[in-house]
């Protein structure tokens, strides 16, 4: 039963917030009144459990209305969910997505272990990336007809979800602030050894597609291939073109999973604290309960190493500063599930249903304690 390996606790002082939409994102203080910032931690296939909690938060509850969130942020699998939330997806949209969601297709069967090992030795990653890309395309296309309309595109436009850029999202936010929300996701430019924040909160990413940013944020090292962007050292921006009409120095840079640096992109708020003077922070996090599993070979060892890194690895370098500066509300999912646990579609639907039902009944509840 699900009760054996999941519990949810929330460190929160519930606040009845009044949300006023803001179009100007360049003011000294990003938002003139207290706003809500909602982060979803990276955790591989553990994101299935997060969907169950989000389903609950879509309904009336004593904590927060998702439509009252101003910025959604996430890392790795959290970036996928954050993008959907930023695009204004409703509960029915995520339910539509869950209907065809199947994580068992992400990894090779154990019978293909020799081929998996060969791919790793020759290409540097364990798994073919087709199914991850298909998943991201699917979630970006859920409401594409509405998005086309809101962007004033022709009815017969071939504009797809994979074409949506950060600039498009900023345009949607300005025109329909009740529906679309700001986005903040992180990745790691391993070529420059830097944590990178891809966001609508500045102009550096206007030409980059949400599709590519998700792939960059969720590119588990040695599991999936890294993403590639070109870096212009003159403009200090990333681009798709390897050449320019000027003499700017352009380098091809590799991006890997944001969880290598931080499982939630809280550091962006610290680095830009003058722009976030009055915010409530909400963070959906995973705490993994250690469990024994036998190491049967190099592939199993790599999987365990990555699971350890993303489950117990580095958190925000300034978490103490965050707690001092902001009201921090933490939803902590305590799981024995691993980063690479795979679930078929029926299992996914059952997990999300059970979590939703248990949140609704109070069997899984949010404990209110003062944030420190």
From Swiss-Prot:
The active site is at 76 (nucleophile), 257 (proton acceptor). A motif (DGA/G) lies at residues 257-259. Pfam families: Patatin. PROSITE patterns: PNPLA. InterPro entries: Acyl_Trfase/lysoPLipase, NTE, PNPLA_dom. Keywords: Hydrolase, Lipid degradation, Lipid metabolism. It comes from the Viruses. Gene3D superfamilies: Cytosolic phospholipase A2 catalytic domain. Probable lipid hydrolase. This is Uncharacterized protein L620.
């Amino acid at each position: 039963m699900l009760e054996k390996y999941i519990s949810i606790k929330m460190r929160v002082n519930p606040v009845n917030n009044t949300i006023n939409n803001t179009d100007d994102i360049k003011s000294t203080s990003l938002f003139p009144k207290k706003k809500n910032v909602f982060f979803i931690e990276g955790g591989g296939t553990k994101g299935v459990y997060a969907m169950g909690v989000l389903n609950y938060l879509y309904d009336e509850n004593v904590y927060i209305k998702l439509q009252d969130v101003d910025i959604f942020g996430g890392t790795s699998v959290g970036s996928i969910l954050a993008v959907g939330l930023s695009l204004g997806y409703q509960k029915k949209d995520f339910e539509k997505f869950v209907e065809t969601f199947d994580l068992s297709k992400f990894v090779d069967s154990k019978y293909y272990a020799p081929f998996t090992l060969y791919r790793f030795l020759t290409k540097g990653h364990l798994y073919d990336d087709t199914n991850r890309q298909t998943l991201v395309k699917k979630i970006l296309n859920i409401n594409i007809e509405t998005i086309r309309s809101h962007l004033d595109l022709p009815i017969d436009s071939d504009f797809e979800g994979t074409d949506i850029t950060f600039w498009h999202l900023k345009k949607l936010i300005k025109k329909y602030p009740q529906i679309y929300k700001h986005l903040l996701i992180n990745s790691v430019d391993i070529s420059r050894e830097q944590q990178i924040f891809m966001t609508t909160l500045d102009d550096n990413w206007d030409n980059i597609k949400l599709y590519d940013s998700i792939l960059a944020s969720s590119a588990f090292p040695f599991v999936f291939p890294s993403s590639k962007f070109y870096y212009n050292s003159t403009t200090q921006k990333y681009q798709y073109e390897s050449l320019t009409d000027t003499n700017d120095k352009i380098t091809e840079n590799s991006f890997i999973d944001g969880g290598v640096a931080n499982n939630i992109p809280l550091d962006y708020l610290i680095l830009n604290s003058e722009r976030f003077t009055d915010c409530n922070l909400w963070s959906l996090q995973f705490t993994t309960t250690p469990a024994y599993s036998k190491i049967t070979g190099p592939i199993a060892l790599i999987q365990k190493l990555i699971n350890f890194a993303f489950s117990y690895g580095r958190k925000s370098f300034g978490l103490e500063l965050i707690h001092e500066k902001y009201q921090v509300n933490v939803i902590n999912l305590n799981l024995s599930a691993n980063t690479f646990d795979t679930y078929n579609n029926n299992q996914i639907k059952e997990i999300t249903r059970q979590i939703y039902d248990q949140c609704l009944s109070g069997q899984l509840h949010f404990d209110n304690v003062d944030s420190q």
